[in-house]
Amino acid sequence: MSNQVKIFDTTLRDGEQALAASLSMKEKLQIALALERLGVDIIEAGFPVSSPGDFRSVRSIAQEVKNATVCGLSRALEKDIDACGEALSVADNFRIHTFIATSDIHVANKLRKSQDEVVEMAVNAIKHAGRYTDDIEFSCEDAGRTPIDYLCRMVESAINAGATTVNIPDTVGYTTPTEFGGIIQNLFNRVPNIDKATISVHCHNDLGLAVANSLVAVEYGARQIECTINGIGERAGNCSLEEIAMILQTRQAMLGLNTNIRSHEISRTSKLVSQLCNMPVQSNKAIVGANAFSHSSGIHQDGVLKAQNTYEIMTPESVGINKNNLNLTSRSGRHVIKHRLEELGYKAEDYDLDTLYASFVKLADKKGQVFDYDLEALLFFDKQKPADEHYKLLYLQASSGKEIIPSATVKLQVGEEEIIESCTGNGPVDAAYKAIIKVLGHEQLEIVDFKLDSKGEGADALAQVSVIVEYNGRRFNGIGLATDIVESGVKALIHVLNNTHLADQIDHQKKQQTQTAGV
């Protein structure tokens, strides 16, 4: 049996299901390219049949990703599989992942079919997927609660039908490592054709056992792990990619297993997903948390200074955390910024140096010193700006204080027109938002969520505002970054407005295409 474990990342599919607002196509592509750079073997890009937006995102990722297999999810239905086949057809390498529930609970209450009928549906779906590709994955949804005899029968039938990967999900995170390891062991002992397919696992974290169950599965012969960056996902999340990858790397001598993950890319991939998904990483999170390599105990600090491995089983550098907190100032030149970004793991093609440097100088003039976390925040935010901004902030003034009615004046460029409005509110941000809504001339926007995070340390740290807005029945996410909280909040709302404008343009184009096709 091979000692190579494939890493199947489902951040863009299962992970996105945990978000309050969907990622934009541009954001999904950013994450996909980061996963490719990380060394992920298979990227599950989405569920193409679920919406036109998801279809376009999967197709865009399929076109751009060259060094990983791009995968689309489908139910065991022909229309789902056809949508996958069409969306993925532009990829160099692609996989169709189809699934059906197999536990008694699901078969009886959700599918309302007999076990024989479910097997037939699975076989037909796999054969239909074979019209598009030889790389077919089949999942037995809720395998963790499926009777072992029926699970063995389903796996054997799926492989005979043409599935090259069979996935065994612990869909509700119910099993313990002993139970889940026993399921995998039983499959290898009882399914006669199991050597003709890769056995995969997809573990949820409802009882905090997703990583442990994934680990025991590969010890019993599974050779693909489905996981997500930062462990994000439905309910309590999924197996954390960074945790399982570093377990296999750190304990390689004992486990004898390898992956293609480039561990030095873990930290920045984690940061990117955290930023784009608006899901902060807990400080004590293994591998990527802010405290993962911190030592406060005097005894521990003394030990680490004498020999790093006294209290560190891996180095921060091994996951891409650089300890050099070089302080940059407005006197630092472009070459210094470029060099520092190279040390942080960013390549020249990851950013526009002129644009980034202009933002850096403005920030340095305000703060005096700019730190690594500031620089990375600027790089991230500059990437989020649309190439063609329909809405631009030209002027902002806000006032508030004790015994003062909060007010704000905002001047926006809307297309070719400049509009200025003033409003009062319950606070300076509320006043600024009301002024912007007056500029728009309508009240179709509903603020669903407003979140403020500090990016850095001290009172002069950058403020990042993430705002979720409901517009025409859809949710849009925006991010703003500034040393001033009100400015950051306004930038976040303008980011949303540009996203809604782009969505309106796409909807208009689709209507025109439909009308043209009907003529």
From Swiss-Prot:
InterPro entries: 2-IPM_HCS-like, 2-isopropylmalate_synth_dimer, AIPM/Hcit_synth_CS, Aldolase_TIM, LeuA/HCS_post-cat, LeuA_allosteric_dom_sf, LeuA_bact_synth, PYR_CT. Its main location: cytoplasm. One of its GO terms (molecular function) is 2-isopropylmalate synthase activity. Coiled coil: none annotated. One of its GO terms (biological process) is L-leucine biosynthetic process. Its EC number is 2.3.3.13. It is an enzyme of class 2 (transferase). SUPFAM superfamilies: 2-isopropylmalate synthase LeuA, allosteric (dimerisation) domain, Aldolase. Pathway: Amino-acid biosynthesis; L-leucine biosynthesis; L-leucine from 3-methyl-2-oxobutanoate: step 1/4. It catalyses: 3-methyl-2-oxobutanoate + acetyl-CoA + H2O = (2S)-2-isopropylmalate + CoA + H(+). It is found in: Cytoplasm. It comes from the Bacteria. Mn(2+) binds at D14, H202, H204, N238. CDD domains: DRE_TIM_IPMS (cd07940). Keywords: Amino-acid biosynthesis, Branched-chain amino acid biosynthesis, Cytoplasm, Leucine biosynthesis, Manganese, Metal-binding, Transferase. Homodimer. Belongs to the alpha-IPM synthase/homocitrate synthase family. LeuA type 1 subfamily. This is 2-isopropylmalate synthase. It comes from Pseudoalteromonas atlantica (strain T6c / ATCC BAA-1087).
